[in-house]
């Protein structure tokens, strides 16, 4: 097993930088057949976050989410009606969840292990929950997070100093509380819902039931607050003919509405007098104790299970006054009836009895083990193989549960190990990027890579890479387009087509296929000269330059015909022009045809409105073109050549240009909120992709899996086979540090450059000796024989020497450029990348020399000064009449 302390996590990185590190460092170490555990493909998000933003729920298990919402609704009602708990820092209103500023009973110093993580990448309520979980007790965090213990599963009973009521049943409390369309009444606890513009029937019936216990004086105010008159008309209820209220506790048909009055309205409206057997009740507490005991008689034993200290008696004493106003104390004792005293917290116990009643007629929620709350046993975690350990620690927040002073706490697992405490369980929270869990993205990316075919890029069909003109005709047409002045759109189209037809008539030879380097320029020039609006967008996808050209209006045969007819052409004349210019028009209407089924989504993410032939209205022609980036452009040559120490070499990202583009693409995918593994795969540069993909598309051997399968019973004759497997695995799957190769490769270029300049100097000296002898002969002829050698002969000799030095320097430049390219290719090959299809051009040689030139400038200057010295020496000895007629020019 890999030592826990040596595992490197990525907790402090976020968004595109984090995802880039995962793809570039973790993904290459996974086999293509690596299977991501299904439990890790989803994560935990606090229900409050999801209720405010439904899209956040896409990364959670729906059954777990529904269970958490139900449980959280119960816990919220318990917390908000209790005088002791006060653990929630929010208040739920119609359509919104508001943060409250009043103190809550949560401590940031309870956990002995200090938390230093912020979790800014999490939604606000999930982040708040996680901070509570890592600073307070695990029990309180589970209460706030809506935890439900799975039945018959491997889970942990957390320890806590004090525990709260644990009710578990299916409900819609949170949805009811957050229902947006409610009457804006003074009493916020009772939410009267509006359905189709009118008070809901259920709430109307309950309010009518409560209304009978409100005094005559307060009823108008009550009716106005809840629009009772409008609702009564809607439901056909005559408020004036309602039966008189039954206000005697002995004959009252139901205590429901009287309890509701005590629960919600007692402090806002005055209540009518309540009687017991004709005697007027004197105390509100006795009324609520009697009614609550009678209504929820069967639930009192269940209440006592949760609150053993609550007073429960077999009788109740009611203080009343008879009709003559004499005090009468009535002791009520009924067979098999208990009376509970809830006066210490009426609101809480009325609410709790309602919860117990709902539980009695509902089904309990069944859930499976949660990786976020229950996790796995620590021993199970330690027994995981290298790949699983690396994958989990890089894609998930990893927590541990431990006990301290008979209380269970949760902290970052590495912090627990550092504090030298013993974890009991390990909990995982898969991270989310761009609306998907990173674990799921990695799974999709591996699947996309495994199912890929040989790489293809959008390549133009060769049959439409010409306009039917020979090379001479094409060049004439190309130059003619450059001369086209700004003219009206219709006129420009007609003139270009007629010019083409004129050139076509006298043109001979096979069609000239447009070269890829001039294709985009020709497209732009052709359509712009015709008056089309042409715009170009360029970017990088993977290791390819992407060009997207949009042409407005859309180019079709019908549009061309209609445009020609607008320029005084008859339909017949327009058809003749089109027939004569068939190859040109076929090229024009076919430019948007490209093939690459793997890149459709890739381009859609670049320009969403350009997918499938342009905008929804079909007003544009879209041309997509992709060309591989040259080798030197993929490499950070400036960073390489500016590094002078080993540390600087190691800090250099060799493939910085394409990696930077990859990060930008990841950032855009994340912002879209619709990132997929296919997106990552399409945007992945070769330097990463080639470290994952092996020849023939087969997966390499997983060292971890292979070592797991080796047992003491393995045949000793398998030693050589196992050794070969290990060597092959190390060769194909172990990531090599590219930067360690740079110093060795590039220093060799400088050394070879010095060696080659010495060789060049020797050869130049030998050749210069011939010119020196020639100059000596001319000097002898003029000095001894007094014969005059013309300046043209002398100048010709000096020009030949200049040509010799130019050729020598050109050969030297080509040699150094090749040496530099060889060093670059050496770096790429040793980095595990494939360069079999690389094609080196003259431009690459020029660029290669320009990159290495600053490092060898002193040697070049030395050679130039040496050559200049020879030139000036010969020129002086030749004694030319016009000495300024020829001079030595260097670079």
From Swiss-Prot:
Site for Cleavage, residues: 614-615, 697-698
Domain of life: Viruses
Pro-sequence residue ranges: 615-697
Pfam families: Pox_P4A
Gene Ontology MF: a single term: structural molecule activity
GO cellular component: virion component
Post-translational note: The precursor is cleaved by OPG083 to give rise to the 62 kDa mature protein during virion maturation. Proteolytic cleavage of major core proteins OPG136, OPG129, and OPG098, which occurs at a late stage of core formation, is required for production of infectious mature virions (MV).
Family named by the database record: Belongs to the orthopxvirus protein OPG136 family.
Name of the featured protein: Major core protein OPG136 precursor
Native source organism of the sequence: Vaccinia virus (strain Western Reserve)
Upper lineage: Viruses, Varidnaviria, Bamfordvirae, Nucleocytoviricota, Pokkesviricetes
């Amino acid at each position: 097993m890999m030592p826990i302390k040596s595992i490197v996590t990525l907790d402090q990185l976020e968004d595109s930088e984090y995802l880039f590190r995962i793809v570039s460092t973790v993904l290459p170490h996974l086999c293509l057949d690596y299977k991501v555990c299904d439990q890790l493909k989803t994560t935990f998000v606090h229900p409050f976050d999801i209720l405010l933003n439904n899209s956040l729920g896409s990364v959670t298990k729906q059954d777990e989410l529904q269970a958490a919402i139900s449980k959280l609704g119960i816990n919220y009602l318990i917390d908000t009606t209790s005088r002791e708990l006060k653990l929630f820092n929010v208040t739920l209103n119609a359509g919104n969840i508001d943060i409250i500023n009043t103190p809550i009973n949560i401590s940031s110093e309870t956990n002995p292990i200090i938390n230093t993580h912020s979790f800014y990448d999490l939604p606000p309520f999930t982040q708040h929950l996680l901070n509570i979980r890592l600073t307070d007790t695990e029990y309180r965090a589970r209460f706030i997070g809506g935890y439900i213990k799975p039945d018959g599963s491997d889970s942990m009973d957390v320890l806590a100093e004090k525990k709260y009521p644990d009710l578990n049943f299916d409900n819609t409390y949170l949805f009811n509380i957050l229902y947006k369309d409610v009457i804006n009444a003074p009493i916020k606890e009772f939410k009267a819902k509006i359905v189709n513009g009118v008070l809901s029937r259920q709430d109307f019936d309950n309010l009518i039931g409560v209304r009978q216990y409100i005094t005559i004086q307060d009823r108008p105010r009550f009716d106005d607050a809840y629009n009772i008159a409008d609702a009564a008309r809607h439901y056909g209820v005559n408020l004036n003919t309602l039966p008189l209220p039954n206000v005697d506790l002995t004959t009252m048909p139901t205590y429901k509405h009287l309890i509701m009055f005590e629960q919600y309205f007692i402090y806002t409206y005055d209540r009518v007098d309540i009687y017991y057997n004709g005697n007027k009740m004197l105390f509100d507490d006795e009324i609520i104790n009697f009614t609550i005991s009678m209504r929820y008689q069967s639930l009192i034993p269940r209440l006592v299970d949760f609150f053993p200290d609550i007073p429960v008696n077999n009788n109740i004493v009611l203080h009343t006054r008879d009709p003559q106003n004499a005090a009468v104390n009535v002791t009520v004792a009924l067979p098999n009836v208990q009376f509970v005293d809830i006066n210490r917290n009426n609101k809480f116990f009325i609410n709790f009895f309602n919860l117990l009643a709902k539980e009695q007629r509902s089904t309990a929620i069944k859930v499976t083990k949660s990786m976020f709350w229950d996790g796995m046993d620590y021993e199970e975690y330690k027994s995981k193989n290298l790949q699983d350990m690396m994958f989990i620690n890089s894609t998930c927040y990893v927590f541990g549960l431990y006990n301290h002073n008979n209380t269970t706490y949760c902290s970052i697992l590495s912090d627990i190990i550092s504090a030298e405490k013993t974890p009991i369980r390990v909990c995982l929270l898969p991270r989310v990027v761009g609306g998907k869990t990173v674990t799921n993205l990695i799974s999709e990316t591996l699947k996309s890579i495994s199912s890929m075919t040989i790489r293809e890029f959008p390549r133009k069909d060769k049959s439409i890479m010409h306009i039917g003109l020979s090379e001479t005709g094409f060049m004439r047409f190309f130059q003619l387009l450059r001369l086209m002045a700004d003219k009206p759109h219709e006129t420009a189209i007609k003139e270009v087509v007629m010019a083409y037809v004129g050139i076509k008539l006298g043109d001979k030879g096979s069609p000239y296929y447009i070269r890829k380097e001039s294709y985009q320029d020709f497209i732009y020039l052709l359509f712009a000269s015709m008056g089309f609006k042409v715009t170009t967008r360029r970017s990088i996808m993977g290791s390819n330059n992407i060009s997207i050209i949009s042409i407005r209006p859309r180019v079709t045969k019908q549009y061309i015909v209609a445009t020609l007819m607008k320029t005084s052409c008859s339909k017949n004349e327009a058809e003749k022009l089109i027939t004569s210019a068939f190859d040109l028009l076929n090229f024009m209407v076919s430019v948007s045809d490209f093939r690459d089924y793997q890149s459709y989504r890739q381009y859609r993410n670049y320009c969403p409105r350009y997918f499938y032939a342009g905008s929804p209205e079909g007003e544009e022609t879209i041309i997509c073109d992709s060309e591989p980036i040259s080798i030197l452009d993929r490499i950070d040559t400036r960073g390489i050549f500016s590094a002078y120490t080993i540390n600087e070499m190691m800090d250099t990202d060799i493939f910085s240009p394409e990696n930077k583009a990859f990060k930008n693409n990841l950032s855009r995918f994340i912002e879209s909120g619709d990132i997929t593994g296919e997106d990552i795969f399409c945007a992945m540069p070769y330097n990463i992709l080639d470290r994952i993909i092996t020849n023939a598309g087969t997966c390499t051997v997983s060292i971890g899996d292979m070592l797991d399968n080796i047992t003491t019973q393995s045949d000793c004759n398998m030693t050589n086979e196992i050794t070969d497997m290990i060597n092959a695995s190390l060769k194909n799957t172990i990531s090599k540090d590219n930067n360690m190769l740079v110093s060795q490769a590039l220093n060799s270029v400088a050394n070879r450059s010095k060696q080659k300049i010495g060789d060049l100097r020797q050869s130049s000296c030998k050749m210069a000796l011939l010119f020196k002898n020639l100059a000596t002969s001319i000097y002898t002829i003029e000095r001894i024989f007094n014969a005059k050698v013309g300046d043209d002969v002398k100048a010709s000799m000096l020009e030949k020497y200049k040509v010799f030095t130019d050729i020598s320097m050109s050969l030297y430049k080509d040699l150094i450029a090749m040496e530099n390219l060889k060093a670059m290719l050496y770096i790429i090959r040793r980095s595990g990348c494939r360069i079999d299809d690389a094609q080196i051009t003259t431009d690459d040689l020029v660029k290669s020399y320009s990159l290495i030139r600053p490092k060898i400038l002193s040697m070049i200057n030395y050679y130039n000064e040496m050559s200049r010295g020879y030139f000036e020496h010969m020129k002086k000895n030749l004694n030319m009449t016009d000495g300024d007629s020829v001079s030595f020019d260097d670079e």
